[in-house]
Amino acid sequence: MPVFHTRTIESILEPVAQQISHLVIMHEEGEVDGKAIPDLTAPVAAVQAAVSNLVRVGKETVQTTEDQILKRDMPPAFIKVENACTKLVQAAQMLQSDPYSVPARDYLIDGSRGILSGTSDLLLTFDEAEVRKIIRVCKGILEYLTVAEVVETMEDLVTYTKNLGPGMTKMAKMIDERQQELTHQEHRVMLVNSMNTVKELLPVLISAMKIFVTTKNSKNQGIEEALKNRNFTVGKMSAEINEIIRVLQLTSWDEDAWASKDTEAMKRALASIDSKLNQAKGWLRDPNASPGDAGEQAIRQILDEAGKVGELCAGKERREILGTCKMLGQMTDQVADLRARGQGASPVAMQKAQQVSQGLDVLTAKVENAARKLEAMTNSKQSIAKKIDAAQNWLADPNGGPEGEEQIRGALAEARKIAELCDDPKERDDILRSLGEIAALTSKLGDLRRQGKGDSPEARALAKQVATALQNLQTKTNRAVANSRPAKAAVHLEGKIEQAQRWIDNPTVDDRGVGQAAIRGLVAEGHRLANVMMGPYRQDLLAKCDRVDQLAAQLADLAARGEGESPQARALASQLQDSLKDLKTQMQEAMTQEVSDVFSDTTTPIKLLAVAATAPPDAPNREEVFDERAANFENHSGRLGATAEKAAAVGAANKSTVEGIQASVKTARELTPQVISAARILLRNPGNQAAYEHFETMKNQWIDNVEKMTGLVDEAIDTKSLLDASEEAIKKDLDKCKVAMANIQPQMLVAGATSIARRANRILLVAKREVENSEDPKFREAVKAASDELSKTISPMVMDAKAVAGNISDPGLQKSFLDSGYRILGAVAKVREAFQPQEPDFPPPPPDLEQLRLTDELAPPKPPLPEGEVPPPRPPPPEEKDEEFPEQKAGEVINQPMMMAARQLHDEARKWSSKGNDIIAAAKRMALLMAEMSRLVRGGSGTKRALIQCAKDIAKASDEVTRLAKEVAKQCTDKRIRTNLLQVCERIPTISTQLKILSTVKATMLGRTNISDEESEQATEMLVHNAQNLMQSVKETVREAEAASIKIRTDAGFTLRWVRKTPWYQ
């Protein structure tokens, strides 16, 4: 099947596919309509010339290359293309003498398909060789990174730096060229991100090596920390380069991303559970421990982490973990309630506490087993990939030694492990059957090579057979691992809500459990938010979570019994929809409040750590102060990460923002212990310049990452809501200050005033970012003026707070401070108002009564109605032709996933009127065309010509959507929305081009009996996946274009009318 993951492959395949589509249509006209096929000598000669040139270049490359895999894989591709060309030439010659020849028509269609498939194979083989060149450079850097472990002198360090630089430059250049060539936007982003991380870590590596060499040679303290810093940086760089190598080899969507994320999440959850277990059990053992203190919070965090693991599991494993979490949560509530009533030492309370303690052990064991199983399957999958890669090199070399056989045997052993962990017996048996076949073929090939016949035609054919069988085995094991995981919900809130809504609307449709997974994900996030809330707020949110959970379970039960369309189910669906809306609103309010509190000050703890690390050697309690500040910094960093994750999950962020937050949280978690180690080196080596520079490097890297995280979190939540939450928090801080002054508590006053100042500065940062993001001069001016006013109020308030703290009983000073506080509040309100400009009054106010003029003149008489005439009725508004989505007829054969993707786009576009909005009109047209394609692709109706023409019409509508979206982006004043719109719409042309090529491939197979079911199904699968991607990209483009149209330039000549068919308030 054709792959086109690079622009070069796509640019060569498109014109070939265009020529082939003409030949396919001619074939059909001859076969179905009985028409004479015209002389094809000229078009066939054009195809032959293009392909022959490609083959000639390929053969020249094979002669000069040292790449054994290229030498092995090129000849079969040459033969395939040349045979197909021969068939086309023969067909053209036969049709010259007999335009109605049936064998000639067969040659024509088979040759056409062979040309497309063979050209694709040829281009892919070329491309794989180019990728191997880049990988060789990457592996060279990987090997040289390990040399860092033996660098122990400054001379060695200088030499190491000089040698590493050119290699890094070469790798960066090759990666940059490669990412520009890729058509998959996600793969481009992954390569760029990993390469940028490697570049950022290079100075950190040199700094870490330098401090290690310095401490080792001077025999100073801190060598262990220096070693940790160096090894961490080497490990991190190696991991990123390995990720680059993995992404370079991807030719389609990324199947492995979830596995590494899930394994990492499980390990992190386990580590967190282990660290909290003693504290939790201590609270349970002590009947006098207060409810709500750190011990109870530890239990809540354990249940939260275990719940995350449960959500990553499937089937029985998932039910057991989540059921245990829920039960232990309820029992902990009961223990806390009994202790709050002073009954903590009662037999009932003691028994409950002991049951919770035992339950935590059981839960931990279940979580460990789940993590172990996922890690085993993931490790086996990754091991198979490496061993098969090595085996392919051995298979390409006729004189290869016995080590290749060992690699194959190792791959088969790992595949057997996956088979044994499979829940599906059919999948397990399929893998085991493949293992037996590959073992037999490999043994036969090994015998031939040991006899010195490795270069014989039989051995070469066997080697090719084993190579293909290994690739098929890898596909089967990958699928088995993927199927062992639960259905994946969207990563962002709107995506989850949409998936949930789709299931609620049609609970009987099989969506592979995605809708219910989305609801479970939302409920799980609700529980996580509730865990940090206190008292009635927590209970209220938990009650809403439970309500959604119960309604979803009841609806799923009805659907399972075949009653998903019953009146009871419809009533349940309506209740569930309302409950989800309530839950979403409360979750977003809770999350915004938490962001306002936790992100009000991100850098003070690291600055205090820096002060402690640079304290003079004779400072009192130097070590104790440092340890305390290091612990505070670590806790603070953890809180930032946890809150950012909640903002990603519950905020209004898009997928790229969510992934950006997750990446920055991961980096913060990794950097935090390294910063503490660097600070400890500085503490133990006062005055050491290398230690100071190294700490500064690590500190700045942490601060830069947290600033990036803060910006992304601000993107994820509504700015107006954040300002509202911050304003409310300042009011509460001001109330605390009043209490402090009344109770003569200067420290409490200082804490409140400091919090007010931090929150005000945070508001200034948010406002500054929004000004930088906007190109609307009026908005920028209004926000900047309000920000400047707020900025002027902060310092006077801090000065007044210091004055009143020094003499807290002075009423005059108290009044001055409160006046300063209220001025800050007033300035904050003005900033908030600048983000919500006043709407003009509607309807307009009546004119002043003074303007009315009364006269004595009578009004003229009313003219008589026309006699004998009946006014014509008002004509009905013209109906929009693209409103109705075609329903599937009884017995009609369609491709269900393709039809579903088309329906989802149509549902999105139907929210808006297409009058005066060409994007909506084109999107509806595309959805209807894709619905038609879902019929054609199964060959149930229509023709090859219809399939090819349908793909062309979809591509034409795609071009229209892209052109219009770019026009909207050009006029949008919001840089962030503009970038999002361009990123989404720029995917569309590539996908629509691929759709045309894949449709041509599929058309060559319709009605043919000499094609295997597997080959035909593979072509359909690729076409379906492409169609789903296209529909999703257009759907996202519609949403982003609507958002961008709100922020359009006032002087823009280009406008689109966005009129909702169903108003938002209904």
Swiss-Prot record:
Bias (Pro residues): 860-876
A GO BP term here is: axon extension
The UniProt annotation puts the region (C-terminal tail) at 879-1066
Instruction: Show the GO MF annotations.
Output: actin binding; alpha-catenin binding; beta-catenin binding; dystroglycan binding; small GTPase binding; structural molecule activity; ubiquitin protein ligase binding
What's a single GO CC term here?
zonula adherens
The membrane topology of this protein is:
Peripheral membrane protein
Write down which residues bear the modification named Phosphoserine.
97, 260, 272, 275, 290, 346, 434, 574, 579, 600, 721, 795, 809
Query: What name does the UniProt record give this protein?
Result: Vinculin
Per the record, the gene is Vcl
